[in-house]
């Protein structure tokens, strides 16, 4: 049953607008906390946005206003080393937070934590959508939610009862992501064109927003230029100087 749940995931962008109770939200957070965490640092915090004005501003800043408007719960998932700084002070030491390694640890911790939250939510019949758009305006979002030094927003997330469900989007074939004993680049020459055929058929036949497109073209268009070049300077301002 768990495998079936995971394989049927699709992002939900329009919800029925009914709020999810605090009891359920806290249950989902407690479940999320049981995810694996590097060296038990638990380098995550979540902003639950219940203030309608803040929710509206978040939607505008991240470029997803309708998702936030109709959702039953709106969140910003953050990498958090501020709490670890407080832990160090209790022990009379200054922790070294500003390292590239700690950024990676925080990103991994938040991602695992969030995915536990998502799977638990979907098991209860809710839909979700991750929102990377919070990194478009990270300084403004940090100010909106009073995020201190050593805390930065990684992604947003909406949850709610779906008003409409999307079809499951085909993933890359297993052979494209599973490498035995050593990395194999040559297989992409065969696998990627075949995957393009799969994605072209999906886009042409899905129930809404049909288009002519394929995966390699999407990725080429997406990665042809540097994305969010402001992030490095933003992280430095937050105390992460990539030592």
From Swiss-Prot:
GO MF annotation terms: oxidoreductase activity
Family indicated by similarity: Belongs to the flavin oxidoreductase frp family.
The protein's name: CR(VI) reductase
Listed cofactors: FMN
The enzyme's E.C. designation: 1.-.-.-
The entry's keywords: Flavoprotein, FMN, Oxidoreductase
Keyword Flavoprotein: yes
